[in-house]
Amino acid sequence: MKTKAPMKNIRNFSIIAHIDHGKSTLADCLISECNAISNREMKSQVMDTMDIEKERGITIKAQSVRLNYTFKGEDYVLNLIDTPGHVDFSYEVSRSLCSCEGALLVVDATQGVEAQTIANTYIALDNHLEILPVINKIDLPNANVLEVKQDIEDTIGIDCSNANEVSAKAKLGIKDLLEKIITTIPAPSGDPNAPLKALIYDSWFDNYLGALALVRIMDGSINTEQEILVMGTGKKHGVLGLYYPNPLKKIPTKSLECGEIGIVSLGLKSVTDIAVGDTLTDAKNPTSKPIEGFMPAKPFVFAGLYPIETDRFEDLREALLKLQLNDCALNFEPESSVALGFGFRVGFLGLLHMEVIKERLEREFGLNLIATAPTVVYEVHLTDNSIKYVQNPSELPPENHIACIKEPFVRATIITPSEFLGNLMQLLNNKRGIQEKMEYLNQSRVMLTYSLPSNEIVMDFYDKLKSCTKGYASFDYEPIENREAHLVKLDVRVAGDVVDALSIIIDKNKAYEKGRALVETMKELIPRQLFEVAIQASVGNKIIARETIKSVGKNVTAKCYGGDITRKRKLLEKQKEGKKRMKAIGKVELPQEAFLAILKID
């Protein structure tokens, strides 16, 4: 490890890109060019440390790496902060960008600007970052560099006449890019002699060192002899260790200077003690006020998670607590369901976040889980003028107690090739969307801005968007406000009992259609019983759809050979009596597929 560089030779930058535009590959190239990792240890997507990240080709957890580079005889330190590209993880992007002075805006030369790129670039511009446009994948035969440059200028308004053209796969233009980073991105500003002020922009749990904070030193410096005050909690802790970030191993250091990025170990048991966005300062000589402008991540989607083996409830709690150590956006509370037993109501940032958490619980902790239909938080105004916030359909008060229900809306930005515009607008209308703006970016691409109910996008909107545009559309959203809506609770009754885990809150006009589809699907999935089973969809006390599963008949007259008909009739009557009694007391076991099917029904 080379000696520390002066503050004027430090560059802190991040990479903004949409999924699949080559961000992790470009990060690999920069790491390789600066020899931060030996060729023997280098592997693709080195910044993506989770198996799920590599398999899905996405970045979930923002990583950082310290690179050394010599330019014109001077040693520079380049701190690269890798950011996720998916809409669910935009909170990771915003906090990573707060610790940088510049950002590389990476755009695929074959695809042009996408919705998520625009959203993250605006976050960077709000933080006054220097933006360097980078056109990636220029070696592909269908690359259209000039059109993409024009696209960036028209959509975002950044001058692209000197944009760097690179191919991360073929390692073209990487040296020029590194030199451009040094000459264009400003050095960090801050006062090295002021009291310590460090921004926590990420935290995670290490099995050996406890909760670790990834920090950017804004003012002053930190060393291993110091006592640190966490300003959010008001607690003081000794510094157990300081490290420079590297994807393969942490590099120990005795101090972190102003403008640097590093890892601080305070020997804490949980990341809740070092919340992201909090400020670290010197306990003996504290800074006057913490760093402003950080908001905790708020869950957007809620779902129930239940273990299939009911005795593994405590294992699920342990697993969620462990994941929460690394994921400050994950929150959960216990809940119980008549149909599914004990489980947890879990809050997620979005559907991908929910999928990733469920997959990690199953893969890393060996749990088998049932997830209920995802919901959002509704604002329910009651007739006694009070307001109740409901995230679980079973908590919705009776209809005669409700004055009105308000549901959260989002503003969605969608960029699509113009040939799919008709299909897309039809989908948005089906999802109760309200068009706000439509603008042609060029002859072949359109940007649509719609306001949509959050409830409509948490189910299957993303999949439907991709299928109706053959995968070419990109989508981003931001929450706006709660608006009044005509919503009802749709219940599913099996053999007369309400299955609370299958209840959903839905637009009144869609209730019949959804109810019919639900009971038809359930009829296919529930095995036949020894008694007749009625499956009903109801709104309040009104049954709106019904299907019946016929009973399995046992041939009770098989042993009668000819003889008197009254003997057979007596046996059949006895069987009918038994079935009637069974129907009154019998319970129907619902297969897991029934709960999964509700997510798939349009």
From Swiss-Prot:
It catalyses: GTP + H2O = GDP + phosphate + H(+). PANTHER family: TRANSLATION FACTOR GUF1 HOMOLOG, CHLOROPLASTIC, TRANSLATION FACTOR GUF1-RELATED. GTP binds at D20, H21, G22, K23, S24, T25, N136, K137, I138, D139. InterPro entries: EF-4, EFG_III/V, EFG_V-like, EFTu-like_2, G_TR_CS, LepA_C_sf, LepA_CTD, LepA_IV. One of its GO terms (molecular function) is GTP binding. Residues 8-189 form the tr-type G domain. Its main location: membrane. Required for accurate and efficient protein synthesis under certain stress conditions. May act as a fidelity factor of the translation reaction, by catalyzing a one-codon backward translocation of tRNAs on improperly translocated ribosomes. Back-translocation proceeds from a post-translocation (POST) complex to a pre-translocation (PRE) complex, thus giving elongation factor G a second chance to translocate the tRNAs correctly. Binds to ribosomes in a GTP-dependent manner. This is Elongation factor 4. The gene is lepA. It is an enzyme of class 3 (hydrolase). Pfam families: EFG_C, GTP_EFTU, GTP_EFTU_D2, LepA_C. PROSITE patterns: G_TR_1, G_TR_2. Its EC number is 3.6.5.n1. GO terms for biological process: positive regulation of translation. Keywords: Cell inner membrane, Cell membrane, GTP-binding, Hydrolase, Membrane, Nucleotide-binding, Protein biosynthesis. NCBIfam families: lepA, small_GTP. It is found in: Cell inner membrane. Belongs to the TRAFAC class translation factor GTPase superfamily. Classic translation factor GTPase family. LepA subfamily. It is a peripheral membrane protein. GO terms for cellular component: plasma membrane.
